[in-house]
Amino acid sequence: METKLMKGKMLFAFLQYYKPYKKTAAFIVVGSFAVAFLDLIFPVFVRHILNVELPQQNLQSILLYALFLLMLYILNTVLLYWISYSGHVMSINIERDMRRDLFRHIESMSFKFFDNNRTGQLLARLTGDLTEIGELTFRGPNDVIICLVVMLGTISIMFWMNIYLGVLIALLLILKTVHTVIINHKMKAAFRKNRAKNGEVSAKAEEALSGIRLVKAFAAEELECSLLMKKNEESMAVRKASFKILGYFSSSVNFFTNFTNLFVLVAGGLLIAANKIQLSDFIAFLLYVNLFMKPLLRLTVFTEMYQRGMAGFARFYEIMQIKPEIIDAKDAIECKNINGSICFKNVTFSYGNNKVLNNVSFNISAGETVAFVGETGVGKTTLANLLLRFYEPDSGDILIDGINIKKYDQRSLRKNIGLVQQEVFLFSDSVRHNITYGLSEVRDEKMVFAARAASADEFIEKLPQKYDTEIGERGIKLSGGQRQRLAIARVILKNPGIVVLDEATSALDNKTEEKIQKALDKLTRERTTLIIAHRLSTIKKANRIFVLNNGRISEEGTHEELLKLKGLYYRQYKTTLDKNKLLDT
């Protein structure tokens, strides 16, 4: 019962995508009925000519009927053209709408969703799955209507022409229908597995190509190729199984077609010998049998398309049914003109069963610069992720300017927080696009000002097309320091009330860090700043330092105050100094 209800909901969701194109869909439906009706007319005219016009040798009437049939064929051709054209346009529009909805839905998910779903799998659902669905949205109503009308029409006419042959054909059709239902069930399961395996292949390929520099650095090309081929072999095994079912189905339809023709020929011959049917009726009957077989063969192709398309839609629907973990409140307010005070109240957070933060509380005044230090994995970056509402805490509250961040709408909240990370993500586009990303109608003066403030203009001016220079995938044409300065320029232009620096200089050499540090000083001036770092030069400038340990804040104070405590911070500081001395040596 639950499965039937789910199928009903899925079908309803599928049909909703026809709403914006109901005029086109109506034209396809009416046009398909007309095409099917025109297909049914030809044998009727043949029977009439054989029964009436030929015995009377009325050549003029025969020519008139031929001319009339020619006009009908031309009309049929024109109808088929417009049905095909408008139907395919409708299908790509529906495919676009589904892709837009799926992409927006995926974008609305919290980071937890992306932690549990591979990018390649999601890409497969956005591309291959939806392409299969798009074709089905047109071929579905078109093929089904034409095939059903022609098949039901031919069966009805065959019953009218000769009840004996009609009953025999109907019995054969019932047997074939039962056989088709059984095969369809197997095909559906096979194509569902096929789409899943294709997604795994896409995920593996995407992972290997994204990390191609690491792959080459470790000379692991053969390893990655073998892993991809393993996934490919698994996909091929599933596809081979589906091809067996499809091959069996196609060949069985072909056998049924030939057997039916043979059966009608033998049965018709016996009926003619027994004077139960006229020769002209028998010829018309044979024409209708062949006309009946055309949609049957067409349905064979459609069945494969239907199973592929619905398997793709099932995967689409599966994602669309996942509710975003973090949603805006109905009465959410816009976050704007913030002062920048931050308060964490008894915040607890876990990644699955791994508790990272345990009842953490602290206050940060507006305009204050605070650093968070601690061993790797103690939850420093998690604090930033929670502040930006990338994740929802298990318990506790986070406030900005005394208002719980759950009361702000997410877009405006994030627009007021600037994030600079160690791993800078840049788009495969121009310098201009990457600096102005997320902002609309930015004047060139403002963009250049932000670049200068981030000390980025000195290298941008040397680029071939300056701000319009393409920087390659993830900014590969730029150095690490240059990418970092673009990221800082992006945040300066954003002009947020709160800035989060997440290991922003940890991967840079000392000379580059000096340039970046100057840019960061301009960025953080008179803004609330959260620093997550190991570099002493960055930490020392903080008004306060929080030391995280075992999911809690174990120490708090200025750099000098924490050194006097001779606790965890002091030991980490000494260790860092010893390492630096060793490196200098």
Named regions from a protein language model:
Residues 25-82, 86, 159-164, 273-279:
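Transmembrane helix-loop-helix hairpins at lipid-water interfaces of multipass membrane proteins
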Residues 69-76, 80, 173-175, 246-260, ...:
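Hydrophobic alpha-helical segments in the permease module
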Residues 117-120, 193-241, 331-333:
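Loop segments that connect adjacent transmembrane helices in multi-pass transporters
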Residues 335-585:
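ABC-type nucleotide-binding domain
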